[in-house]
Design a protein with these regions (language model features):
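Conserved hydrolase catalytic core segment
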Residues: 1-13, 20
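Short helix-capping segments at alpha-helix termini
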Residues: 7-8, 135-140
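Hydrophobic/aromatic beta-strand patches that form the interior of the parallel beta-sheet core
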Residues: 11-13, 112-114, 144
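Accessory cap/linker subdomain of secreted extracellular hydrolases
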Residues: 13-105
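Short beta-strand/loop motif that positions the catalytic acidic residue
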Residues: 107, 113-115, 119
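Acidic beta-to-alpha connecting loop that harbors the catalytic carboxylate
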Residues: 117-120, 147-150
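Conserved alpha/beta-hydrolase "acid-adjacent" motif
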Residues: 120-129
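Catalytic active-site module of serine/aspartate enzymes centered on a nucleophile-bearing elbow/loop
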Residues: 138, 142, 149-153, 157-187
Length: 187
C-alpha cells in the first residue's frame, strides 16, 4: 500500500493486510487470548487499557506506564513487563507506529483487498472498513471479506494460529481464483 501511495505500482493486492496501526491488532489479539483463558472481563479490559496506553506512549516517545500499581494478577504483570521489553526493539516500536490510513487517499491505482472472516490476527471488519473509507474510489477496487478463512486464507474452524498446522489446505482456491480473475479484468 505504501508503494501504491507513491505511485510506484500499477495495482496493489492486499491479502490479510493490516491498514490500521499495529497497536490496534496487538491489543485485540491480547483481548482474544486473555478472554479464551477464562480471565474475568474486568481483568482483560484493565490489561488491554494498560497495553494500549503503553503503545500510545511508545508512539509518542513518552515513558511507558507501569503495571506495578494495577490490580492485575502477578502473571499478567510479568507478561506486561515482557511486552514492555519488546517495545524497546526497533521492529515492535515501528510496527505499532505504522498506520497506512493517512496514505490511502493518495492511492489511485486499482486495489484488491481480501481478508478472512476467521482471521484473529488482523480483524477483517476494521481493516476493510478503513480501506473503504480511505481509498480514492477507483472503480476497479475490490474490497471484500472471504468467508470462513483464517489469516493465511485456509478454511478453518476457529482461526487460531495453533490450528494452521492441522489444516491441509495451503490457500483457499476461491482466493486464488479471485486474484486471477481480478488481475485478468484489469486489462
Amino acid at each position: 500500500m505504501m508503494l501504491a501511495a507513491d505511485k510506484q505500482v500499477d495495482f496493489a493486492i492486499s491479502l490479510a493486510g493490516m491498514i490500521v496501526s499495529g497497536a490496534e491488532p496487538l491489543v485485540e489479539q491480547n483481548r482474544i487470548a486473555l478472554t479464551d483463558t477464562g480471565l474475568p472481563e474486568e481483568t482483560v479490559n484493565e490489561y488491554c487499557r494498560l497495553l494500549a496506553s503503553a503503545f500510545d506512549a511508545c508512539k509518542d516517545g513518552k515513558p511507558l506506564p507501569s503495571a506495578d500499581n494495577s490490580d492485575l494478577p502477578e502473571a499478567l504483570k510479568r507478561n506486561y513487563q515482557a511486552v514492555m521489553a519488546q517495545l524497546q526493539t526497533p521492529y515492535l516500536s515501528r510496527f505499532i507506529a505504522v498506520d497506512v490510513r493517512p496514505l490511502l487517499p493518495q492511492i489511485t491505482c486499482p486495489v484488491l483487498a481480501l481478508n478472512g472472516t476467521k482471521d484473529i490476527q488482523v480483524n477483517y471488519e476494521t481493516n476493510l472498513e478503513a480501506l473503504r473509507n480511505g481509498l480514492s474510489g477507483n472503480t476497479a477496487d475490490v474490497i471484500q471479506e472471504v468467508e470462513g478463512v483464517n489469516h493465511i486464507f485456509q478454511h478453518c474452524t476457529t482461526g487460531a494460529v495453533a490450528e494452521y498446522k492441522e489444516i491441509e489446505e495451503t490457500i483457499s482456491p476461491e482466493v486464488l481464483s479471485a486474484i486471477i480473475t481480478w488481475i485478468s479484468n484489469l486489462k
